[in-house]
């Protein structure tokens, strides 16, 4: 386990799946210093950054533009891997790491002034049969199994893990895959073409069940923040509090329409850990 020390930073933010480095750039350019993200902060992306879909040089050039903004505003950007990322590019030696951008390996711990955050990437691509191996899909995309060595490293930590930042989530958190699946569930539709999908997806989320159990034995986890599901879920009474962050919407996603108003989503789903009840994405428009 690698430990990154950013204890000089108090402000901590998270956002959901950007699906592209250009979107990460747009989030940084448009939302830093706009009453959404403060300067002097650590920001976590919950995976699916689109790393590896282009060649190294192209990705590096795009990340340099992001890094320039991070330097200007004294921001440290932490990218964890999703299922739409090349896992081999997420480590301490990644050629894509920048001065203020870290593509972190699984089970990296980031220490800030108030919180210690463990990063756990990976998930199963439900549309993998429609993707190209080693270009838009990678076989080792799933959540890393918690082996004995990792268990011992977790037990040996001399500080508390306060927050889990992951791409996927345990089986008992939203969205729950209630069986038998119905045709309105994308997992069901893709499983028609992929005979191993349901089992692989269940195993992947079960890995996070085991991780949660192991972490809870020696830590008091306050929040578990994740992405992957392209929706916003917020557990009310669970401990830890589980929060799923929605993906980035370039246009709008209508949630509810009345005679007088339109409730919709747009932009990134940004979570300020010091103000967890405020989210950037949901808007109300009078009509």
Give the ranges of each region predicted by the language model.
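Conserved beta-sheet core of the metallophosphoesterase superfamily
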Residues: 76-80, 95, 173-272, 281-283
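Well-ordered, non-membrane alpha-helical segments in soluble/globular domains
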Residues: 25, 57-67, 146-153, 201-210
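Core catalytic region of metal-dependent phosphoesterases/phosphodiesterases
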Residues: 2-6, 15, 21-112
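Beta-strand-turn-beta hairpins that frame and shape the catalytic cleft
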Residues: 3-13, 109-119, 160-163, 236-242, ...
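Active-site-proximal loop/helix segment associated with metal-binding centers of metalloenzymes
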Residues: 115-206
């Amino acid at each position: 386990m690698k430990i990154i020390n950013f204890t000089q930073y108090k402000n901590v933010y998270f956002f959901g799946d950007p699906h592209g480095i250009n979107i990460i750039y747009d989030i940084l350019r448009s939302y830093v210093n706009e009453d959404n993200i403060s300067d002097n902060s650590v920001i976590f992306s919950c995976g699916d950054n689109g790393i590896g879909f282009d060649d190294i040089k192209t990705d590096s050039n795009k990340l340099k533009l992001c890094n320039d903004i991070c330097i200007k505003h004294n921001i440290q950007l932490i990218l964890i891997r999703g299922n739409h990322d090349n896992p081999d590019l997420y480590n301490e030696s990644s050629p894509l790491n920048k001065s203020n951008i870290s593509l972190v390996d699984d089970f990296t711990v980031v220490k800030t002034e108030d919180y210690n955050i463990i990063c756990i990437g990976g998930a199963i691509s439900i549309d993998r049969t429609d993707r190209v191996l080693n270009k838009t899909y990678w076989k080792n995309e799933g959540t890393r199994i918690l082996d004995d060595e990792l268990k011992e490293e977790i037990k040996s930590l001399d500080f508390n893990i306060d927050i889990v930042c992951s791409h996927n989530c345990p089986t008992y958190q939203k969205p729950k895959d209630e069986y038998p699946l119905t045709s309105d569930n994308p997992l069901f539709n893709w499983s028609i073409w992929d005979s191993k999908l349901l089992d692989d997806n269940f195993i992947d989320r079960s890995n996070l069940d085991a991780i949660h159990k192991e972490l809870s034995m020696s830590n008091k986890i306050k929040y578990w923040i994740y992405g992957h599901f392209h929706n916003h879920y917020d557990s009310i009474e669970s401990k830890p509090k589980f929060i799923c962050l929605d993906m980035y919407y370039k246009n709008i996603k209508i949630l509810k329409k009345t005679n007088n108003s339109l409730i919709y989503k747009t932009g990134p789903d940004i979570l300020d850990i010091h103000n967890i009840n405020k989210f950037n994405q949901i808007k109300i428009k009078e009509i």
